[in-house]
Amino acid sequence: MKQHTLKAPFSFEGKGLHTGVYIHANFLPAQENTGIRICRTDLEGRPTNEAVADYVTATERGTVLERGAWKVSTVEHALSALYAFGVDNCLIEVDGPEMPILDGSAKFYVQAIQKVGLQEQNAEQKVYVVTEPIEYISERGSKMMILPSEKYEVEVKITYPTGLLREQKAELYDLKEYAREIASARTFCFVREIEPLLRMGLIKGGDLQNALVIYETPMSQEGLDYMTDKLGQPRLDATKLGYLSPLNYQNEPARHKLLDIIGDMSLLGCRIQGKIMTLRPGHTFNTQCCKRLRNKLLASK
């Protein structure tokens, strides 16, 4: 299979989920063997680095890449869409420290890629072919198994101690189904997580338009009012538990976790031929697994 890049550029602008900063992002065609590279156009010298696991420095509610002054947060949704559509080479220019969150999914990235199309290049794709089972287990009970397969496949299972999200599964057995089955799954959080995240200086750009918020633990009306006021949202009835906005899929949280896995594992720096099976994944665990797999890949060269 040959490498591919974009046929034409496309652009987005919007606020960052965690910084709240308004950001412009340009996606440009790139020469073969470039990989996915991100340029901070707002910094002196326009520092540019490849989006690979080597530069992951933080994973609190998103994946952060950092090397010296160069730092870009919440890269996983854009990377997920690029990987799913087979974009091997692309230069992403951003004028701030974070990718725009858009609606919290990969939908708009997918639509843009579909609109401009792909350009086949001369070089062959770089592919890591899984030849034997690989297993990673975290101390917190997260698991990842990567198995040999004829193609790229992902299975996800998530569990939470709550009635709404006690257990969900999502699967993707063909990347051709990504646009329909995965791309519109939005990032999510629980109401009980919002105040701690705000205190950590995160989700400054969060609202009900760019995240699926889950209200599963009853709280006082005063407490819920505080949360919605902080997010600049209309006040809600504290007696009504559930999702605070309509679902795009019945198992949207699990599908979004799958979306994140594709983006995080793309930090390997090449394509993967194998089946990824995960239990209780998250950005920290995903990127730790990717780093170990990348070290294995580099050591074999």
Positions of PLM-derived features:
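Short acidic-hydrophobic catalytic motif
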Residues: 1-301
